[in-house]
Amino acid sequence: MQNSIMDFLRPRLVDIEQISATHTKVTLEPLERGFGHTLGNALRRILLSSMPGCAVTEVEIDGVLHEYSTKEGVQEDVLEILLNLKALAVKVYGKDETLLTLHKSGIGSITAADIIHDGDVEIIKPQHVICHLTDENASIKMRIKVQRGRGYIPASSRVHLEEDSRPIGCLLVDACYSPINRISYNVEAARVEQRTDLDKLVIEMETNGTIDPEEAIRRAATILAEQLEAFVDLRDIREPEFKEEKPEFEPILLRPVDDLELTVRSANCLKAEAIHYIGDLVQRTEVELLKTPNLGKKSLTEIKDVLASRSLSLGMRLENWPPSSILDE
């Protein structure tokens, strides 16, 4: 219910129809006009592209070197076997990848129930057919690599990345990680009191059984909400640039006059005038220094030459001298 004309209607879940264990229809209303397509399309795209899942990515079949081979005693060719494995619905708990094995001989069909796995793996449809053996002496042995991921990654995009480390006979499979087999949405008319221009969103979805349809919709809505959080509070989130602070005084000015290695006579004259740092010295003029007892023109020339060798001179003006670091001492 709206409190004012400026408020937006808040939708609510009206109905969740469980058609089967993997097929669900969800109805959401009322939505403001146009919001049905806005939300429906966004959720549909996220459900198709961003739901995590598990998929077969690599297969090794004894006696098979490439996907265009055939195996004696097996009804299907290798390409068809790979397509059947691509459609395998499997869940892996606690790790990102695992290796399954399959070894069967004798006439009969080979299904997902024949796959050997540990307790961290769950085969959703054990009746899923992988291939058929047509000869009593026929046998097939394979190793199946299953990985966790998101979206769809074709085998062609991984060929160059894994070419050096991939052993001969290791067949790459297009990885379809998405647990969503089919999803569609429909926008119908809805009504609230006198308003008849509202939307009703109906989402119909089928999964491969590795995820509950309701959980998939909740997860997609969470992803959408998290991606939109940045727009709720728009601000500059760039890292602040830290500029290196330039020291208030050149380091040489903070050094004691003893570092100038003056003669003993000149050094003693400066200390008698309480000139302890080079910064104290450069602020004095020639006239001021000549008034210092026992400091003559020879000592003055020595001081000027030593300062000049360090790109300094007498009569310099230093604002805010002395610095607090010297005062604290």
From Swiss-Prot:
Q: Which reaction does it catalyse?
A: RNA(n) + a ribonucleoside 5'-triphosphate = RNA(n+1) + diphosphate
Q: What EC number is given for this enzyme?
A: 2.7.7.6
InterPro entries, per database record: DNA-dir_RNA_pol_insert, DNA-dir_RNA_pol_RpoA/D/Rpb3, DNA-dir_RpoA, RBP11-like, RNAP_asu_C, RNApol_insert_sf
Q: Which Pfam families match?
A: RNA_pol_A_bac (PF01000), RNA_pol_A_CTD (PF03118), RNA_pol_L (PF01193)
Stored SMART domains: RPOLD
| Domain of life (superkingdom) | Bacteria
Location of region: Alpha N-terminal domain (alpha-NTD): 1-235
Q: Gene3D superfamilies recorded for this chain?
A: 5' to 3' exonuclease, C-terminal subdomain (1.10.150.20), DNA-directed RNA polymerase, insert domain (2.170.120.12), RNA polymerase, RBP11-like subunit (3.30.1360.10)
One Gene Ontology cellular component: cytoplasm
Subunit structure, briefly? Answer: Homodimer. The RNAP catalytic core consists of 2 alpha, 1 beta, 1 beta' and 1 omega subunit. When a sigma factor is associated with the core the holoenzyme is formed, which can initiate transcription.
Q: Describe its function.
A: DNA-dependent RNA polymerase catalyzes the transcription of DNA into RNA using the four ribonucleoside triphosphates as substrates.
Could you give the domain comment from the record? The N-terminal domain is essential for RNAP assembly and basal transcription, whereas the C-terminal domain is involved in interaction with transcriptional regulators and with upstream promoter elements.
| Protein's UniProt name | DNA-directed RNA polymerase subunit alpha
Organism for this UniProt entry: Buchnera aphidicola subsp. Acyrthosiphon pisum (strain APS) (Acyrthosiphon pisum symbiotic bacterium)
Source lineage = Bacteria, Pseudomonadati, Pseudomonadota, Gammaproteobacteria, Enterobacterales
